[in-house]
């Protein structure tokens, strides 16, 4: 498909909050795409475009739909999982194919097991599954390895050129696909009061999400996952030192594990074509086996 494919930007009431999302029309089953901490659904755009019109694609935005302070423990991922289950229920979508990245992968897993999100298949890209002993620890923001950095994140640029120079200078963005980098510049930043640009997902909101990551242990849920699962791990991911995704795959009854060559933790941003092809193959196989 070409870049002419564009989603509708919609909002869904889930009872005590509203979640904005991108909706791509399609003729087939629903694919739910859930992003990583601090990012946004627009970064799925090349992948969503590749899935339509064979699939209907829904990509929600989880940043600030709930108020949470990082100093008070942040936003519990168990709460996010419940929100995702209600979001799908309110939209009337069930037995969905789900792809989550990082936070999105973990939240998706919790939503499936704890809140009954009906899924036909899960693709978990670099899920955040910390060592079990870290869950339940009450960390201060300055002691959390990710929240402490997020809350200090650079959050001001004079214009798009200034912002792009900054992004291109940072190791985090160095291997991103060019289209996705421009999508981040366009949708991941917004005008600030001083007429410059700032991050759409405020650093305090991002830090609150990171703080919430240690409040619920997802490991005991893995043996209860009932659908086929594919875990994708970046070959060069910096998560490898503390996240054992082979162990996670072994704990899930119908899971397989696959390495994405040349990718770091941000697999969808660095290898969108590989991810899109993998999703089409995995979801297509599930459809063929059920027909």
Question: Model regions: which residues?
Answer:
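Alpha/beta-hydrolase fold catalytic core
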Residues: 1-33, 52-56, 93-94, 129, ...
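Conserved HGGG/HGGXW glycine-rich cap/lid loop of the alpha/beta-hydrolase fold
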Residues: 20-70
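Active-site loop/oxyanion-hole signature of alpha/beta-hydrolase fold enzymes
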Residues: 22, 46, 58-99, 277
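Helix-rich cap/lid subdomain of alpha/beta-hydrolase
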Residues: 132-196
